[in-house]
Amino acid sequence: MSILEVKNIRKSFGKENVLKGIDFSMEEGQVISIIGSSGSGKTTLLRCIGFLETADAGTVAVDGNIIFDASIKAKHSAEEKRKMQLNFGFVFQSFNLFPQYNVLDNITLAPKLLAKKRSDYKVNKAHIFKEIEDVALRLLEKSGLTDKAKSYPCELSGGQQQRVAIARALALNPRIMLFDEPTSALDPELTNEVLKIIKSLADTNMTMIIVTHEMAFAKQVSDKVIFMDGGVIAEEGSPEEIFGNPKTQRLKEFLSNAKL
């Protein structure tokens, strides 16, 4: 059974059709990179999958269960939408850390808020919070940021902030990680430290969808590559097929201008 199945996802903004019927599926532990020119619909697709945008048509299923169906016109409550979003961990090109909180608090804030819904919260609050903080500290250790737990975002480099953002997303134990151009706001020197973290997640069989302009990285880390153009999937296949034997003229043109 596929961990994620996306069927006929369509999205328009005004008169502009941004997504024109997107279909794909992925297996648990698989890494899919989505490539394409700016404006091809990559980010909008990612946002529709994770319910940051509401698709006009189509369905999204996780573990065989349809969690979004655009044909059902009743609006989802904020609580329902949040429950759907918990299947996914989000990492954006802008780090979106809370400037008023230190690194540890940025990572533990959402898990602690969710913990309040537990039936044993009042009785075991201290123990629950200790477990959450222990998880956060382990994530910081894996990210090479143990010494930054009490630092604030303004005291970190861009690469360090993005690594904290990744740790924050992982702290909620998502089924699937969604990365939207996670290195585009970074200097070249800082890009590698973030890509190294993402590669380490792939090595642990974390299921991931990565929108990226880092072609060499996509070639290295992906099980499957999707090339989007004009709101559709123009071509998809293994990294060897996409980068080594592109079939469409549009993909050939795109790759000729990309750094491989």
Region roles according to the model:
Residues G50:
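Helix-to-loop junction immediately C-terminal to a conserved catalytic motif
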Residues Y152-L156, Q160:
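Conserved ABC ATPase signature
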Residues A171-R175:
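A short, proline-enriched helix->beta-strand linker immediately N-terminal to the Walker B motif
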Residues M177-D180:
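Catalytic Walker B motif of ABC-type/P-loop ATPase nucleotide-binding domains
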Residues P188-L190:
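Helix N-cap at the start of a conserved alpha-helix in ABC-type nucleotide-binding domains
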Residues E236-G237:
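ABC ATPase "signature
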